From Swiss-Prot:
Disulfide bonds join C66-C89, C75-C94, C79-C96. The keyword GTP-binding does not apply. Inhibits voltage-gated potassium channels. Residues 63-102 form the BetaSPN-type CS-alpha/beta domain. Pfam families: Scorpion_toxin_alpha-beta. This is Scorpine-like-2. Residues 1-19 form the signal peptide. It is found in: Secreted. Belongs to the long chain scorpion toxin family. Class 3 subfamily. Transmembrane segments: none annotated. GO terms for cellular component: extracellular region. The lineage of its organism: Eukaryota, Metazoa, Ecdysozoa, Arthropoda, Chelicerata. GO terms for molecular function: toxin activity. Its main location: secreted.
Length: 102
């Protein structure tokens, strides 16, 4: 039960991290360290800690909610406003005027 509660708290941290701008990534990484220290099984603790840190890092690098596809059109709108070019999601990055080649 304690492990499930800790994993749930980690998911809440990841959700907050995806909001961006409110807090820096390092604060979420410290939260991951604190929460995973409460998992009693060492192997599970290490796996969950590693996965959560990678997830927090990837989500915090996200631009305009890009996740391979621009589902909410924020990338396109920001590029049209800034450079008057179409915006395309390249993984988690938004690039203006550069089409995806894959």
């Amino acid at each position: 039960m304690q492990t499930q509660c800790t994993v749930l708290q980690l998911l809440v941290l990841v959700a907050l991290c995806s909001c961006g701008g409110i807090l820096k990534e390092k604060y979420f990484q410290k939260g991951v360290d604190y929460l995973t220290s409460h998992i009693p099984i060492p192997v599970v603790k290490d796996v969950v800690k590693s996965a959560a840190k990678q997830l927090v890092h990837k989500i915090s690098k996200n631009q305009q909610l890009c996740l391979i596809v621009d589902t909410v059109q924020w990338c396109n709108k920001s590029c049209l406003a800034a450079e008057n070019k179409e915006g395309y999601c390249h993984g988690t990055k938004c690039k203006c005027g550069i089409k995806v080649s894959y």
